[in-house]
């Protein structure tokens, strides 16, 4: 079983369920992804000079295949990806269903591979509408906003994440809090479409105030909140591991993923798989109180169309965006139920 973390996390995020998965009889590996934690060998030059070809979606899948081979294995029974790790996991399952025998996507649903311009030779153009400039549309709202993925792609984001006025520990504690079930305003619902007026219904940690940084956004959201609530599932000592690692590495390595994910030119490699479906058994596990479920409108509803062997969704009550940390026992059961049903 291969466990793939998201942003801003580490392999350490799987600490609560790894031993129990191993006790169930599996060889379990969690790894730091390219740009995170203890990884090295990736381009850590300045923002302007970074070789972003290292961070394309297909290269992240390649990293994963290379790792498994290096460990002496020729297949993975199940790849489990959380948040941006679910992007890696879904791509691995999409591209190499022979190698990744099943996939669990957590907290970030697979939206499908999209369509290429079709039948253009005969003037019957389908699937080639220009993409919505969502940043421009969000900025034009009565309350101007911006999408966090595009903010995370900017030249200033890494420094702002690294040196928040409230201090890194308080910032990360607040970020965990507002995206968890402990923030009582997390009552997500499906959005109708990928358009500014709909996306703006999401909280500020996803669709940010236009002129605020992420640390400023979190500080304002935390003004009346009790940050101690999250300590029941994220101790000071555990949070200290993240603080230590991010202080050591900085954030640009992790943020480079957003730079490729938000740049159509950097997504050209994925166009090779346009129209392809995930062909191995697949399931989606997520916190019931997680807005991440709906940040790609329609993705959850379309799972039976984007995955040929979709086995259903599991929403875990009492968990927001960090289910394997907020409700590890329930996540463990959901993963084992899926894997053992194959």
Regions found by a protein language model. Give the residues of each.
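Hydrophobic residues on the short alpha-helix immediately C-terminal to a glycine-rich phosphate/catalytic loop
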Residues: 17, 92, 334-338
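A generic secondary-structure signal
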Residues: 20, 66-70, 338-341
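Conserved residues in the N-terminal Rossmann fold of short-chain dehydrogenase/reductase
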Residues: 30, 286, 315
């Amino acid at each position: 079983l291969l466990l793939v973390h998201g942003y801003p996390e580490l392999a350490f995020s799987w600490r609560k369920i790894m031993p129990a998965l191993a006790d169930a009889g599996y060889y379990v590996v969690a790894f730091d992804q390219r740009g995170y934690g203890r990884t090295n060998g990736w381009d850590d030059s300045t923002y302007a000079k970074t070789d972003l070809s290292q961070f394309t979606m297909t290269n992240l899948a390649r990293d994963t295949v290379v790792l498994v081979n290096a460990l002496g294995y020729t297949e993975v029974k199940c790849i489990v990806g959380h948040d941006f790790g679910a992007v890696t996991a879904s791509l691995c399952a999409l591209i190499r269903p022979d190698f990744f025998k099943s996939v669990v996507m957590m907290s970030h649903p697979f939206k499908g591979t999209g369509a290429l311009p079709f039948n253009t030779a005969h003037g019957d153009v389908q699937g080639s509408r220009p993409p919505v400039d969502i940043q421009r549309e969000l900025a034009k709202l009565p309350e101007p906003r911006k999408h966090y993925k595009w903010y995370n792609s900017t030249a200033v984001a890494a420094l702002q994440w690294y040196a928040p006025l409230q201090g890194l520990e308080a910032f990360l504690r607040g970020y965990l809090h507002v995206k968890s079930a402990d923030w009582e305003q997390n009552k997500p619902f499906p959005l109708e479409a990928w358009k500014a007026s709909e996306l703006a219904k999401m909280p500020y940690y996803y669709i940010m105030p236009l002129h605020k940084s992420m640390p400023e956004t979190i500080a304002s959201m935390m003004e009346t909140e009790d940050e101690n609530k999250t300590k029941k599932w994220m101790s000071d000592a555990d949070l200290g591991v993240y603080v230590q690692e991010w202080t050591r590495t900085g954030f640009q390595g992790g943020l480079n993923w957003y730079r490729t994910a938000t740049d159509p030119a950097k997504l050209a490699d994925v166009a090779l798989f346009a129209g392809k479906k995930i062909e191995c058994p697949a399931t989606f596990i997520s916190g019931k109180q997680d807005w991440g479920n709906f940040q790609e409108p329609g993705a959850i509803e379309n799972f039976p169309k984007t995955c040929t062997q979709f086995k259903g969704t599991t929403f875990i009550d009492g968990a927001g965006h960090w289910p394997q940390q907020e409700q590890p026992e329930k996540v463990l059961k959901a993963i084992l139920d899926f894997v053992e049903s194959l």
